Amino acid sequence: MTLSINDQNKLDAFWAYCVKNQYFNIGYPESADFDYTNLERFLRFSINNCGDWGEYCNYLLNSFDFEKEVMEYFADLFKIPFEQSWGYVTNGGTEGNMFGCYLGREIFPDGTLYYSKDTHYSVAKIVKLLRIKSQVVESQPNGEIDYDDLMKKIADDKEAHPIIFANIGTTVRGAIDDIAEIQKRLKAAGIKREDYYLHADAALSGMILPFVDDAQPFTFADGIDSIGVSGHKMIGSPIPCGIVVAKKENVDRISVEIDYISAHDKTITGSRNGHTPLMLWEAIRSHSTEEWKRRITRSLDMAQYAVDRMQKAGINAWRNKNSITVVFPCPSERVWREHCLATSGDVAHLITTAHHLDTVQIDKLIDDVIADFNLHAA
């Protein structure tokens, strides 16, 4: 089988488009400085990781051995003994969050899910798909959950088994919910630790906080029950993917044996991408802890540079602690469209992921934002 000349030209044009725009992204969390050339040879195979990487599967073309090593890495990163954990490589942050919410619902079938207004939009879909009771909690101006409103809603609901959805870096403002404060308040309200579930959405910050000196609490050692992180954001991948880690004792409650594949089914999806575990495996094997720290430090320094430049020009730019998300007043549509910025209400943001090796692109954006600000202030 061969493509027509027109179809081949269409592909060639798209290739040129991708090359031109490879490093365009400054408004969304995506690291483009990856190189998985070593893995291109595996694209000729239909690698499918259906089932549990810890068990035999009758579908032999899987990358379970690599996925297991990926999960060992993230169990250690998120401070839970590997043998007490279970998780898998997902197709992105939404699946990881659904898995966490699913576990919470199975443990507490009548529980209510509490999440803040700044939570990722996918959680509203998850609520509908799982048919789980839910309450939207107010957010503080910086995007952090309003702890007073959280406890008020739990009290008003007389909820004995709350399911808490904590943000470890909100989508728009990069805010981190204080899970220590949440647990302290739940304890003060008389809710025992075994009577609630705590999921952490660390899509972006899950690969930032482990590599800073003054990280906010976010790990299993800090009290979470499950956590999701994206693979294509700080790590970088040509295919969207993610990682979810949970307590094995909770996952075992949902495990079902499937004779079709001679394995247990614990995952949200059946067929799973077998290539993304290879990419994540190569990424973690080819970067030392010190290299990750350097990448994160550079990204944080770049974010602070953007804040300082905008503030010097009189623009109210800011960022949360340990965040590479820089928030500022939303510029005109011409500017945010030209720079592909994410906007929400009256604010926009830029995100300094690791492929920004210099300030050229950031400076161009800031110059346009300053000019736009001055134009409309005149």
Curated annotation (Swiss-Prot):
What EC class is this? lyase
Name the cofactor(s).
Answer: pyridoxal 5'-phosphate
Question: So where's the catalytic machinery, residue-wise?
Answer: S323
The record's catalysed reaction(s) read:
L-histidine + H(+) = histamine + CO2
Q: Which GO terms describe its molecular function?
A: histidine decarboxylase activity; pyridoxal phosphate binding
InterPro entries, per the entry = Group_II_Decarboxylase, Hist_deCOase_bac, PyrdxlP-dep_de-COase, PyrdxlP-dep_Trfase, PyrdxlP-dep_Trfase_major, Pyridoxal-P_BS
Q: Where does substrate bind?
A: H120
Question: What keywords tag this UniProt record?
Answer: Decarboxylase, Lyase, Pyridoxal phosphate
Matching Gene3D superfamilies: Type I PLP-dependent aspartate aminotransferase-like (Major domain)
In the record, biological process GO terms are: carboxylic acid metabolic process
Q: Which residues carry this modification: N6-(pyridoxal phosphate)lysine?
A: K233
EC numbers: 4.1.1.22
Q: Which NCBIfam families match?
A: PRK02769.1
What subunit structure does UniProt give? Homotetramer.
Q: Family assignment?
A: Belongs to the group II decarboxylase family.
Q: What is this protein called?
A: Histidine decarboxylase
Name the gene behind this protein.
hdc
